[in-house]
Amino acid sequence: QRQMCIRDSALAARRGQRRGLSWGVTKEEKEQYRELLGGLGLGLESRLTTKVSTLSGGQRQALTLLMATLKRPKLLLLDEHTAALDPKTAAKVMELTDRIVREGQLTTLMITHNMRDAIQYGNRLIMLHDGHVILDIAGEEKKKLTVPDLLEQFTKASGDEFANDRAILS
């Protein structure tokens, strides 16, 4: 089975198809994809025909984010989109995410267990426990929040200790 390259992925995101995509690519579209990929800062702009399967995890996540935002969605859903990445790559993908969301003025729902990311990014933090909203923090209160503060508020609101060491240590 034919593996998709970066160009095919970008076209599939735009056209909603998988096969026979590259024949309809104009020079202007190729240049647009190069510019968009160049904005990621990952050296992908010169690799339009590179198979996606050969990219690093961070490159794939950044490409996926770019594809998801090509058509300016009404709502961008990000579900643990940095969870499988090493800390340095995760930080780079989060910076890219923040830039793309801000520049595109995209309404975004990001699900994460990373407390620092939950505090640092976005304008509202909602914490769930056992399927219920136990914290909803925004504005100045969120800006002043620290991980220890968040853990303390979680304990008070839920009556439980936070049990996910990975999230605490993130």
What are these regions (language model features)?
Residues 36-53:
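Conserved ABC nucleotide-binding domain
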Residues 132-158:
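Conserved beta-strand-loop-alpha-helix hinge in the C-terminal portion
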Residues 76-79:
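Catalytic Walker B motif of ABC-type/P-loop ATPase nucleotide-binding domains
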Residues 91-103:
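Helical segment within the ABC ATPase nucleotide-binding domain
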Residues 87-89:
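Helix N-cap at the start of a conserved alpha-helix in ABC-type nucleotide-binding domains
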Residues 68-69:
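ABC ATPase C-loop
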Residues 112-113:
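H-loop/switch region of ABC-family ATPase nucleotide-binding domains
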Residues 2-6:
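Short, small-residue-biased leader/transition segments that mark boundaries at the very start
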